[in-house]
Amino acid sequence: MIRTSSAAKAFAIAGAAAILLAACSTESAGSGGASGAASASSSSGKDPAASCKAPSKPSQDALEYGTLLPLTGSLAYLGPPAIAGAGLAIDDINAAGGVIGKDVKISTATDSGDSTDMTVSSSAAQKLIAAKVPVVLGAESSSVTLNVVDQITSNCTIEISPANTATDLSGYSSYYYRTAPPDTVQGSALGQLVVGDGNAKIAFLVFNDAYGTGLRNTVQKAVEAAGGSVVYGGKGKGQEFPPGQTTFSSEVTAALAAKPDAIVILSFDETKSIVPELVSQGWDMSKTYMSDGNTADYSKDFDPKTLLNGQGTIPGSDPKAAFKTKLTTWYKTNEGKDLHDFAYAAESYDAMVLTALAAEEGKGTDAGTIQAHMASVSGAEGGTKCSTFADCKKLVDAGTKIQYTGPSGVGPFNADNDPSSAYIGIYKYDQDNKPVYQSAIQGSTK
């Protein structure tokens, strides 16, 4: 029986706080300004964590995690799978004896919000830094991470995201990692999928967000390399819409006027307003493509068959049935709800396990020690492959080099702290507006 874990308690407290904050807060700085400021910092080429290092005597305290996950906002649907993945990982780690003989826990869970109000993530980052946790899981939005990564990693705290894909984040900080591949991998796969289906003229409906524009650029590059053309929403055209927009009549009208063969929607929760507008203007939804930001279960949002045969991509191969069962059981037991989406659950699980294994190999739970062993346990230096914390821990404790190969299927970290390889899952919508896994393409980062 799975007990109500410390992770579940932390998430419950964070959820209550997020609801209160959402009720009291107002819209403030948009993603353009916040992301722009963060990108300007990254362009300097300076490592925010350059002064951080492992202590001469590694910490022997119990390992504690912080989380920065979307409990509110346009990415809130990605919160449950990440929570389930992280919580299940905590339980599995502790069932195998914990780290350096002590149980691990999530002690500080916070709400990342989304890019429409960066004050939410800025406040959360301050809370996480004050809590002195060595590792923070999150954020899921690339724009949110760009808003807080300097703040978090300059304080010598590891930030590891299960879902960030913006290329701007590759090699951003020596204390920043991700278990999702950069957009160069997904963008190439999505572009090839669209053109491979016989579509020559492509329109983008894309929001002005680091994630949206970055992915659009890589998809466009793949489309044009395959002989296709972009007729609306392309790079440099100034046709992006702001995050949080709720009406799309003019954008859809303009996109359809360009007579595209296919439309690629790159957005988050805005998709729930874009799709009805496309339908009302007579668009064939089977010619619609989406990405990990919006390839989700819309069975409760649209009439049956609305998205039938539309397609989308999500980094990561489809989790095995047994792993999904564990996730749904954990979530139902600890959160009291059904788990409907699995996007980035495996990546969240792997992020927790990798950091725990790094602490075990380094025989210490401080951020510096963990950071020094992250590449090693991921297999960057070669090693015996192992797929569970329990099996890997036995090897590590015996002094054996390992390569952790978890449910997400990502390869070892490269020099930029990105996965060196990853799978991109291809999904097609059924008559209930649910994405159904079709196949996976493996790609390498560059």
Regions found by a protein language model. Give the residues of each.
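Beta-alpha junction/loop-to-helix N-cap segments that form part of ligand/metal-binding clefts
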Residues: 4, 31-34, 77-84, 97-170, ...
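C-terminal motif of bacterial Sec signal peptides marking the signal peptidase cleavage site
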Residues: 19-23
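Bacterial lipoprotein signal-peptidase II cleavage site
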Residues: 24-40
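Extracytoplasmic "Venus flytrap"
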Residues: 45-87, 109-118, 140-141, 207-212, ...
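Extracellular/periplasmic Venus flytrap/periplasmic-binding protein
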Residues: 114, 118-119, 123, 166-281, ...
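Periplasmic-binding protein-like
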Residues: 128-140, 160-162, 203-206, 259-268, ...
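Extracellular/periplasmic periplasmic-binding protein-like sensory domains
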Residues: 278-352, 359-365, 429, 437, ...
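Segments of small-molecule ligand-sensing domains
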Residues: 337-341, 359-434
